[in-house]
Amino acid sequence: MPAKKVLVVSGKRKTAVARAVVKPGMGRIRINMTPLEIYQPEVARQKIMEPLIQAGDEIWKQLDIDIKVSGGGYMGQAEAARMAIANALLKWTKSTQLRTAFIEYDRTMVVGDPRRKEPKKFGGPGARARDQKSYR
């Protein structure tokens, strides 16, 4: 096992920010103090589990990962947590093989998604939608 004691990694998605604290342990993963096994909704839990499944039990069962997530919606938070976990595992193992496996599965696990919401403009309800024009 690496000589590192604690590793802090962050992940972002839209407006959600996740900070993961990784330390040697026995495979406990908590998101905002909630164990991953009972984290709701189910879709978000599956999203967070993706890097763990890709990495394999032998890597993450030796670590305790505590994640604090804030901002955004539940899916944005899940993807931010997923990115934080993936980057933490990469930093902990220093494995290029694991990195290529993550990128082949889904690039946004390792590299951030730059897309953001376009600001609203006047003359309509959204960024591009315009108010309906009336001829009478």
Region spans (language model):
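Structured, basic alpha/beta domains of bacterial-type, RNA-associated proteins
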Residues: 2-12, 18-70, 79-136
